[in-house]
Amino acid sequence: MRFVTVRHDDHQRVALEAESDPHHLGLIPLPFSSLLDVIDAGNALPSPLEWVNVSDVQLLAPVPSPRRGILCVGMNYRAHSLEFSQSGFDSSSSKVTEHPDFPIVFSKFGASVVGPGAIVDLLPQATSQVDYEAELAVFIKKPGRDIPIEEAMNFVWGYTAINDITARDRQKRHQQWLLGKTLDGFCPMGPRAVTTDEVDLANTRVTCHVNDELRQDANTSDLIFSVPEIISVISEGFTLQPGDLIATGTPAGVGIGQDPPRFLKAGDQVRIEISNVGVLENSFK
């Protein structure tokens, strides 16, 4: 199943995409208003649905206000791990020469989330080195702690796409990554959230275009740490909750991997596409 969160008649609603036509949306009755309500309900979705056309709504992030922010995994594609460590921007204690021995985990606050089509402020008063990162993100569907790898997929509800926008100068200057990762608007998310049956984790393409130029192109088969491994490690002594979102890392081809580095500028358009999840597109000012 494929869900979107929308604004319709001045109300935030969550909708189910019609299987035969993604432009035909079934609004789930209130009080359901975001994907979190769908995840909490499990299989008990209310009916009947009110059907509308996608042109009659504004698409929002699947979860416009995450309960606990977003957990993110850094340097989880081998080629990106190498390009980042060689870029001169990694001054953190996680600095590696080839790939990390354990998942590198950081977070983005909920205020960083914006939806598809949102115009992202480059915040020049705070940073001059804004970079893009295409990522597949995983939604957790039930509480769990100390989750074994072999059971981890039982805790996954589904997936979405995010752009883990990063202020590279702040990431380098402060060594820990939080201040470079969680600026306002620096986590575009969407356009939809899909259940696990829609995505083949062993073979899902992740791409990113900047102004129609292909910059990132990889497959989830290239992940250093798999989704089950990531969930197992994060849940060690830490209870994951329904609606928690885990971004799985970005492929090679980010701006700092270019020679010279190519950072985003006003007027740029970034288009992230993940197979069977959709296209997340945002412009920058």
Predicted regions and their residues:
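Residue "hotspots" at secondary-structure boundaries inside conserved domains
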Residues: 61-63, 69, 98, 128-130, ...
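Short, structured patches in soluble enzyme cores that scaffold and shape functional sites
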Residues: 108-110, 117, 124, 132-136, ...
